[in-house]
Amino acid sequence: MEPDRQAEIAALDSALTTVERVLDVEGLRSRIEKLEHEASDPKLWDDQTRAQRVTSELSHTQGELRRVEELRRRLEDLPVLYELAAEEEGAAAGEALTEADAEFKALRADIEATEVRTLLSGEYDEREALVTIRSGAGGVDAADWAEMLMRMYVRWAEQHKYPVEVFDTSYAEEAGIKSATFAVHAPFAYGTLSVEQGTHRLVRISPFDNQSRRQTSFAEVEVLPVVETTDHIDIPEGDVRVDVYRSSGPGGQSVNTTDSAVRLTHIPTGIVVTCQNEKSQLQNKVAAMRVLQAKLLERKRIEERAELDALKGDGGSSWGNQMRSYVLHPYQMVKDLRTEYEVGNPATVLDGDIDGFLEAGIRWRNRKDDD
């Protein structure tokens, strides 16, 4: 093996050792044992929400441990591949060396991707995520675009086996949605998806235009951490107005014969939250209250950041706005305007393949925070 390659493998070993230390491999094993014990309790499924979260965290933690252990195994096998290549002769030697180099490059990319997980060290990064998508300028195309974005994130969650809970969907008249709110139940979902916050821009030939003209549409993505009891977000009963109404589906049609949908208005701030996807009025009220608590927590965080920015003489941050463009015509490209990361196949991105954008966004945010 050439000295340069030996040095590069040593650098990979150092990087992986750091990952193992930061992720606390032994801690992962202990956590898996505890979760497996909880999952084996027959009474766990008496509480469906808790059972879902325990099994989701168990699956995520097991996957995280397997990923790191597999990287370590591959790294230990890598020098053997180069040794075997050195023993070959003629064309076989070239093929074996090509195979070893390909594995080196793949392993390096996988270790770099795993390193991203170690960058999620913010106060709320470990939390589950509450995502809200709102259609912006662009009429029916914007409503359709908002629904496409929702599908993209749901598909991403499904590919990672993360449960998704939809709280509210407000359908537009002709097509698409005005807004939607859903939770992604997975550890570090907030830290991962928070880089998606901002305005997403779509350029395409409008399927709703009889003259097939090019249309630019906008949708806003908001990502909040799910509130936990330790956050102490207390809301006095008198501060919330509760309105009930019938759930509606696409085109404004009623999908429920009872007033099960709930609208909460936080009187002091004017924040309005709706929920209509649960089966009963009580379930919708509980779900809406969870969303309201998350929005009030975010409002508190924004106020604290604004105070800190004022002390630092900083004008604040608006990095989330106009954060990504999805161009389907006249060429095909999805490009993040902050990180410069781009992909030339929008179809795969819109089908949930956004890990590359998430990793680039997390690295960009980490560099920005260090400045």
From Swiss-Prot:
InterPro entries: PCRF (IPR005139), Pep_chain_release_fac_I (IPR000352), Pep_chain_release_fac_I_sf (IPR045853), PrfB (IPR004374)
Top-level division of the source organism's lineage: Bacteria
A Pfam family per the record: PCRF
Localization terms from the record: Cytoplasm
Family: Belongs to the prokaryotic/mitochondrial release factor family.
Functional note: Peptide chain release factor 2 directs the termination of translation in response to the peptide chain termination codons UGA and UAA.
Protein name (record): Peptide chain release factor 2
Chain's gene name: prfB
